[in-house]
Amino acid sequence: MQNLKFLIAAVSCLGPALAAPTPTSNFINSNFNKRASVEDSAFGYASLNGGTTGGAGGTTTTVSSYAEFTAAVQGDDPKIVIVSGPIEETAEQVDVGSNTSILGADSSAVLTGFGLRLKEVENVIIRNLGIAKVLADNGDAIGAEYSNNIWIDHVDVSSDRDHDKDYYDGLLDFKRGSDYITVSNSFIHDHWKASLVGHSNSNEDEDSGKLHVTYANNYWYNLNSRAPSIRFGTGHIYNNYYETVSDGINTRIGAQVLVEGNVFVDSKKALYSTDEGYAVERNNDFGDAKNEALEGTLTSVEYEYDLLDTSEVKSAVVGTAGQTLTF
């Protein structure tokens, strides 16, 4: 297995790299194929700004109904909420408090008909959880605004494409100055508008200098657009596997994105700019698509990460991304 490990100097995310990447051969990703622990550490941008620990050290509650779930995730005291089995309710997003870990016990932990809202909170972990078919009137599957330090890992988020593009809203949307977010090892599929970073061209005052988001080791499948779409922010997108995606990575309105080690199959637009968004791309396999983005300046990030060669991405991601953990 040929792998690259990057130890990056702590430099400005919008500036040029001050240190060249150092190749090594000791790739280890502890998130793959194992029983998970509440002590697992966030990586990517969620590891910065003091890190993201969720409800570590707090009380643990197991829930199996909508009423139990909504009660358990409230408040800002440290808490771990384990979802046991499916919960179905057509309702608006449930507000999640700070210092919270929401963990699906196994692959049956699926929320259907309602999503999660992270508003003016910090330090939230969501892992091994399924969220499906949240109607547009009820918000996103997972949405964050005015919030920071969020780790979304091994989730399965979807709707369908049988309805028009406005029947559902976003799957993973981050806006209004949210910051230090990682989306990893997740299955993002069967949807029109997958993941939006920065909701409006006119929101520069709130978003500029924020919206740092890592997307790592995710499986994007059967999507129309926003995989992801980033305005104003800073994105690091690596080792993702894209299959049957019409519009992939869209960098917009001054965004700076580092795109590396991703694979695109049966996809139309892999990487492109709108309104002067920028990208640096390295070692990607775009298949029949291509890079149509303006050249950017984001050549390094402020954390350590492991990078797979594109020949290894499919086997590492497909079948592993999504709800493949147990708690």
Curated annotation (Swiss-Prot):
Protein name stated in the entry: Pectate lyase A
Active site (catalytic residues): R226
Residues in the signal sequence: 1-19
Cofactor(s) required for function per UniProt: Ca(2+)
Broad enzyme group: lyase
A single GO molecular function term of this UniProt record: pectate lyase activity
Purpose: Pectinolytic enzyme consist of four classes of enzymes: pectin lyase, polygalacturonase, pectin methylesterase and rhamnogalacturonase. Among pectinolytic enzymes, pectin lyase is the most important in depolymerization of pectin, since it cleaves internal glycosidic bonds of highly methylated pectins. Favors pectate, the anion, over pectin, the methyl ester.
Organism this protein belongs to: Emericella nidulans (strain FGSC A4 / ATCC 38163 / CBS 112.46 / NRRL 194 / M139)
Glycan attachment points: N99
Gene Ontology biological-process annotations: cell wall organization; pectin catabolic process
GO cellular component, one term: extracellular region
Temperature dependence as stated in the record: Optimum temperature is 22 degrees Celsius.
Reaction it catalyzes: Eliminative cleavage of (1->4)-alpha-D-galacturonan to give oligosaccharides with 4-deoxy-alpha-D-galact-4-enuronosyl groups at their non-reducing ends
InterPro entries: Pec_lyase, Pectin_lyas_fold, Pectin_lyase_fold/virulence, PEL
PANTHER family: PECTATE LYASE 18-RELATED, PECTATE LYASE 21-RELATED
pH dependence statement: Optimum pH is 8.5.
Location within or outside the cell: Secreted
